From Swiss-Prot:
This protein's GO CC annotations: cytoplasm
Active site location: 89 (proton acceptor)
CDD domains referenced in this protein's UniProt entry, alphabetically: Maf (cd00555)
Name used for this protein in its record: dTTP/UTP pyrophosphatase
Family of the protein in this entry: Belongs to the Maf family. YhdE subfamily.
Amino acid sequence: MPSSTSPALFPILYLASQSPRRQELLLQIGVRFELLLPRPDEDAEALEAELPGEAADAYVRRVTVAKAEAARARLVASGKPAAPVLVADTTVTIDGAILGKPADADDALAMLTRLAGREHEVLTAVAVIGADGELLPPALSRSSVRFSNAQRDAYVRYVETGEPFGKAGAYAIQGRAAEFIERIDGSHSGIMGLPLFETAALLRTARVAF
C-alpha cells in the first residue's frame, strides 16, 4: 500500500539578506533561518545596477532572481546542508523613476523632497530557491504610499538621523519616517522589505517549517 507520509519539512531556511527588518519579519511568523551573506570577494551591489529603460517591476524581479541565483551558488560552494534559500529586494518608484538607496545626504534629501506631498509605489519581490535548487515563481508585492507635504527642514532633520541610508527611497516606514506618511494601500510588511503573506505562501511550497 502506498505510503501517505508527506516529505519532511525543512527546520530552517537560508536568508540571503543583511536587512535587520527582513530578519525581524521572518521571526515574527516563526521562521528559523541562517544567514547566507555575500563573501568579501562578491560584488553584491553590481546586481542592483539598472538597465536602460527598465520598468520598476521588471527591475525588482530581475535583481531578486539574480540575488537568489548568487545565493544558491554561494550555498553550494560552502558545502552547507541543502535547504531552501530566501531572497528579497525592494524598490521605490515615482514618475517612472526607480529610487534606490541614497548615495549620500544630498541624494537622500532629493528623494524625500520628490516624494513630499505625493503618492509613490513600493515594490518588493521575493524569491525562494528550493532545497533541490529549483527557483519557485517569484512573488511581487505592490503598495502605494502617500507622503505628507512636510517642510523641507523636517526632511533635513530626518536625513541627519542617518535612518535614510541603506533604504530604498531614503526612508524606513517602521522608523521615524512614519511621521511623514499620510496613508498606505497595500502590504505594510512589503513596504518594510518582506511581504509576509506572499513570503509565507512561498515557504509552504518550499516545505519550510514554521
